[in-house]
Amino acid sequence: MTKVLMKGNEALAEAAIRAGCRSYFGYPITPQSEVPEYFSRKLPEVGGVFLQAESEIASIYMLYGAAAAGHRTMTSSSGPGISLMQEGISSAAGSDLPMVIVNMMRGGPGLGSIQPSQTDYFQTTRGGGNGDYRVLAYAPSNVQELVDYTILAFDKADEWRMPAFIMADGMLGQMMEPVEFPEANEEVLNRCPKDWATDGRSGERGYRNVITSLELSTPQLEINDRKRYEKYLKIMEEEVIVEEDGVKDCDLILTSYGSAARIVKTAIQILRDEGYKVGLIRPISCLLYTSDAADDMQCGGF
């Protein structure tokens, strides 16, 4: 693999295409506008669909339709746009639909600023819409991780049948760094339709697939929610990705995620050079989990 110097937003979009994403629906907003711009050029070259929606509300429901039909699909936005998508994200979570959503976070609340920020953490990791759901969430700290975890997000969204978020920020989106891309996986690109998808093949199956988040039977809704809760617990056990540095001999643990962790690492090195025993816990997968190192220091979980 050859290294290529790319801006984070464009590298993310290229990674999605190589992961088998063939449909993108979104709306431009700083600091992620290069993502839809890149898709608008590249998706037609691979037979994909790019559509700039009239709003973020429209784009998330276009995503819902593509995911329900079994396609690998993606959208991206920033704080105010992600807020507009919350009803649709809740519907996708309630329908067990895999999709990838990128939040290039900017300052808030409200329209805020276009500067990098991490203020959407709780909105993402605790489910921002109604109904007490969870999503997969990954927080890269450099452009290479932006590539790697975008690809992983598509795989895990399909595996667990749920939305997956990339939690980045304007610094990562606008930063240029050398990255390596894996070769496109032909198995992914030529994947057979998912057996639950509304793909118009009911005659071949002998039954019709219906995708909906509506369940009017209270007992059945309870069953569905319990299944999701059990799934979340399994993910918290099996899908933990965390970087721990210097935690075995430390007196103090600093916690940071995403681009800010780069700065914290430098601060820790300075402190260690001065004789302070300081360690780092960096959550990468940000669905609720506990860290053994944090538990040992009675710090609790994240």
Predicted regions and their residues:
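Short, solvent-exposed amphipathic alpha-helical segments in soluble enzyme
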Residues: S40-K42, S90-A93, Q118, I151-K156, ...
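Conserved small/polar residues in nucleotide/adenosyl-binding loops
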Residues: Y289-A294
